[in-house]
Each structure stands twice: as C-alpha cells, then as structure tokens.
C-alpha cells in the first residue's frame, strides 16, 4: 500500500511575516505603483477628463462623479498587492503627489481627496484582516472610498451649490464608478499583474500560483 501526501496551498494569503512586517520590497513596489498611476492620472487629467467632464456636466452636473473611480485605483491596487496597513494610503498619496507636481486643476487638494479615498480601502482591508483579494472585497473598498470622498469632501468643497437630491445622485454615481473602475478594474489589474509573475513576492502572486495548482 502506498501512502501519498498532498500539500494544500492556502488560497488566501497574508503578507510575508504578517501584515505589519513591512519589507524594503513592499515600500519600493508601493512607491513604483504610485508613481506609475500618478503619471496615468496626469495623462487622464490632461487628455481625457476635460472632455468627459464637460459632457457629463452638460447632461447633468452630478453625473461628473462617474469619473471618481479612476482616482481610487492606486489605493485599491497598492493595498491589495502589498496587503499591509498603510499600503493603500502610501500608494494613493504618492500618486496624488505626482499628479499635483505634474500639474492639475485641483492643486494640492488632491492630497486630501487621496487620503479620504485611501482611508476607505484601508478600513475594508483591516476588516478582512489584510487577507484575500476577492472581487467582493475590492468592490466594498471602492464603495466605502466613494462614500468618504463625497460625504466628507466633495459635497462641501465642489458641490456646495447642489441640492440634497443632486448630492445623493452624485454619491450614487461615485459609488457606481468606484465599483466598476476601482473595484472591478483594480481587481482585474492586480490579477493581470500577478499572472505575469511580477507579484510572486506578494500575496496576490502566491494566490495566483495557488489557483494554478
């Protein structure tokens, strides 16, 4: 009779050493992701956002919040790649800093927005103990980011003249955007990067290997 031993690889992975044990590679990777996405922000701000925003504002101003999900991407991607407390915040703030330095219409206000957006992701990651990059978790992170950004900042700074009904429509649009772009889009982007082998040092990469068997 032959005995066989199988090793089961956990399909949800914690960061190496536990969530709080930051490594140099974590910091460097988070910063690189933030810079890359900050440059992407700048391109979006310069080339696409003006036309998209003008179109949505002409139709109905609260619809402009359908663009919010673009700016929440760094928090979701950084947080779910590195999976340590502060990773989402660091990636988002680096991206916002690059965007501000390259030039945008909001100036340093993007730093406040970035912090609020990242806070939503950080809270959801903490609730799930920084374990597992499931689509539902990414979507929840996007939803909470949208709520914090709109209710704590945009309603008062950019949408002060809106009626309550318009503010609620803007909030709904922001939530939809963050579900689709930063939630689903961020989840898909991390999975795509993991499939290349570039994230093998991180939980997302190890989860990809586990899915492959």
Describe the function of each predicted region.
Residues 21-33, 67, 71, 86-91, ...:
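Alpha-helical transmembrane segments of integral membrane proteins
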Residues 34-42, 93-102, 142-152:
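Aromatic-anchored segments of alpha-helical transmembrane domains
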Residues 11, 25-31, 112-157:
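Short helix-perturbing small/polar motifs within transmembrane alpha-helices
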